[in-house]
Amino acid sequence: MDAFKQQLEQLSAQNQYRSIPDLVHQGRYIMRENRKMLNMSSNDYLGLASNENLRQSFLQQYGGNFPSFTSSSSRLLTGNFPIYTDLEELVAQRFQRESALLFNSGYHANIGILPALTTKSLILADKLVHASMIDGIRLSQCEFFRYRHNDYEHLKNLLEKNVGKFDRTFIVTESVFSMDGDVADLKQLVQLKKQFPNTYLYVDEAHAIGVYGKNGLGIAERANVIADIDLLVGTFGKALASMGAYVVCDQILKECLINQMRPLIFSTALPPFNVAWTYFIFERLPQFSKERSHLERLSAFLRQEVEHRTQIMPSQTCIVPYILGENEATLAKAKDLQEQGYYCLPIRPPTVPKGTSRIRLSLTADMTMDEVKQFVACL
């Protein structure tokens, strides 16, 4: 036990010790230690999680005869329910693709897809892809390289040097990057993919689904490249106010995943009740255009104000990094903002590169411009 204790002491000395906070949620506010704070760290981008009207409308449609609260099994055994297929068909239809497949979480999706599909393959991943994608790459045991962040000339060089050595190549990226809030150029990635044989594009839209595109289908919809992305992954646990994840892809890839993806095969499926809620929200996704427009106005204002103070602004989205550099300064500023009534959280290495500790600000559509202006005055 002494070795574990020393590890924790070392983390504490480096200002990298983490703990799970005791929180009470009140709409867009957080109660912690008897302090009420506006939640500036939520991924509930459209503000749907606290929308009581939506919740009541969903519950009323069942009249007390709710779907099961557990699946009790893997979908490949006895845990499949009609609502799963209904949601997969709806997702595939909205994206105008052959098929969709559900997962228990975005993490499950990202650690399972690549190991299931990448035998004798090369993986080329953006340097800043999410930890879950890195874990999936490691589990695949494939040869892999990481290209410099959003540097497609570097990616092209790696493709030219390596593609002929492998049966298949997978380019892996996020569309909206979770810590910097910047956006991948999906059109350019599609063009690159098409230049090389047996090359597949895998895009994680976790922070884009619901928020971008005319119908809320993400950056791929906005860039008009949905049909060109081989594996388009998204989560229901952020803007869509639910849980779980999906991939849209060709039917043949779906069948391969069903047969070879261990997190899918060996996990108890999501509760049908939650999948029904996801269906309810996803069905209404095109209706939230006002929320998307309002969120963009709030985001543009906050990005401008933070850039004015730090001279650093990689973001193009509602994820706005307030980069302070060192751990101590970041922890102190987060504490100061919490004392002023704003629930802001410090993000430190190894989540972000050393020397780029920041407060990750994420806006939601249920905030007002006055609230954001009042927050800016505290920066």
From Swiss-Prot:
Pfam families reported in the protein's UniProt record: Aminotran_1_2
GO biological process: biotin biosynthetic process
Binding positions for pyridoxal 5'-phosphate per the UniProt entry: 106-107, 178, 204-207, 235-238
SUPFAM superfamilies documented for this protein: PLP-dependent transferases (SSF53383)
The UniProt record lists the keyword 4Fe-4S: no
Keyword Transferase: yes
Keywords tagged on the record: Biotin biosynthesis, Pyridoxal phosphate, Transferase
Enzymatic reactions: 6-carboxyhexanoyl-[ACP] + L-alanine + H(+) = (8S)-8-amino-7-oxononanoate + holo-[ACP] + CO2
Molecular function, one GO term: pyridoxal phosphate binding
Positions contributing to substrate binding: 18, 130, 351
Requisite cofactors: pyridoxal 5'-phosphate
EC number from the UniProt entry: 2.3.1.47
Metabolic or biological pathway: Cofactor biosynthesis; biotin biosynthesis
Class of enzymatic activity (EC top level): transferase
Modified residues (N6-(pyridoxal phosphate)lysine): 238
Functional summary from the UniProt entry: Catalyzes the decarboxylative condensation of pimeloyl-[acyl-carrier protein] and L-alanine to produce 8-amino-7-oxononanoate (AON), [acyl-carrier protein], and carbon dioxide.
Family: Belongs to the class-II pyridoxal-phosphate-dependent aminotransferase family. BioF subfamily.
UniProt subunit comment: Homodimer.
NCBIfam families attached to this UniProt entry: bioF
UniProt-recorded name of the protein: Putative 8-amino-7-oxononanoate synthase
Gene: bioF
